[in-house]
């Protein structure tokens, strides 16, 4: 049996390798983080998907209660589903929320149709709030 060993990758390198569809996973140790993991039976408490298009910086599509980073799509801050620069979102989740981060890279070629589909989904869902959190 072989044991796969993972090594830490500096954020700048991980962000430079980010492709549309990659998943970023975050895990913290606060009471809220532990409650989320217990309620969802998950080893992580926050997940986002990378959107990396053309010459734009990598973006992170995720949902959160926080409203401190301006949403790239809407141009305002709000709660719920949001599209942020990956550097801003991952930085906040690491530094402000004291979360560890992992990435899972997608293992397919993302087509133009797939990119168009995610942009349509973002257009439809961006800014959708969590129930009762307006």
PLM regions: where:
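Cysteine-nucleophile amide-bond enzymes
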Residues: 1-134
């Amino acid at each position: 049996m072989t044991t796969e060993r993972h090594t830490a990758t500096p954020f700048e390198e991980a962000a430079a390798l980010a492709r549309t569809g990659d998943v970023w996973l975050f895990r913290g140790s606060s009471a809220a983080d532990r409650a989320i993991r217990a309620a969802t039976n998950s080893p992580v408490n926050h997940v986002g998907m990378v959107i990396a298009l053309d010459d734009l910086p990598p973006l992170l599509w995720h949902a959160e209660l926080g409203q401190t980073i301006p949403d790239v799509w809407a141009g305002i801050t709000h709660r719920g589903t949001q599209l942020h620069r990956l550097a801003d979102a991952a930085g906040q989740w690491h530094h402000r929320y004291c979360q560890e981060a992992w990435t899972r890279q997608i293992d397919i070629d993302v087509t133009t149709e797939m990119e168009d589909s995610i942009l349509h989904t973002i257009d439809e869902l961006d800014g959708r709030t969590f129930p009762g959190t307006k």
